[in-house]
Amino acid sequence: MKIKKEHMNSHLIGFGKIKCLFPKALRKSGYRVIQRLKERFFRIVAMASPKRSRRYCPCCDVKFRTFSTGQYKEKPDRFNTSRYLQTKQDVICPICGSLPRHRILASWCENHKTFFSSSSILYFAPENCMIRWLERNGISCTTSDPYYSADLKLDIQATGLPVASYDVIIANHVLEHVDDFRRALREVYRILKPNGCFICSFPMDPKIELLDEEEEPLSSEERIRRFGQNDHKRVFGMKADQFLTEAGFEVEPIKGEDYPKEILPVVGPADYDMNILFCCRKT
């Protein structure tokens, strides 16, 4: 399974400079060594002081004293930094880079492991942290990303795949990036097998009911102002699950409040990261 580590490692200082200095194969090997060393270090710390290790990442199965803080506020050319002022920022796993939404998903998957183990899975824009969970549990999947290294280069709006191709389709924070999210939902429904499950999440602004999206291409500055990020084409509202229902799915929310505090299932790092996922069944 190929993944785009850029998704989950943008918070690491100097990572871009390292990419320029070393060839890809060496970077990949070095990355794995560093990850193993970090994982071993945190496991030793957790064993030495179990009572102080109050945080847990189900993606990499490691406990910590605290999670790491992102650098979102330092990137005003990409993020609306004002949307990170009132929310908790120490929410990133220092090993795999997971955010609350990933740890919620991994916890949910843990409770449905039998289903996943026997399912064909298509993962759009796969995150390193969730791939770690799948691999650790012996679950294979097909990855897809039109821009980064992946098994397939598919457009979620028009995959070209046969009808009813997969049992499970995952797309975390993808729908806010595509030109036509309704078309993407129709396509996912088409390629999902009967009784299959589409798991998705997207930014949800608590001040919006349904949707705020661009009607024509906006500048990066305007996207940052309205949608929180320079490559977002919309932000969804708190009743956006309506769009999933309209696409034909039977929708069940996966809420962070239903999961242990040790995984830190909080709102954040942005105020529109409500960290509500949706399990959408094709009935």
Regions found by a protein language model. Give the residues of each.
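Conserved N-terminal segment of class I S-adenosyl-L-methionine
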Residues: 5-164, 255, 261-279, 283
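Short catalytic micro-motifs in class I SAM-dependent methyltransferases
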Residues: 173-177
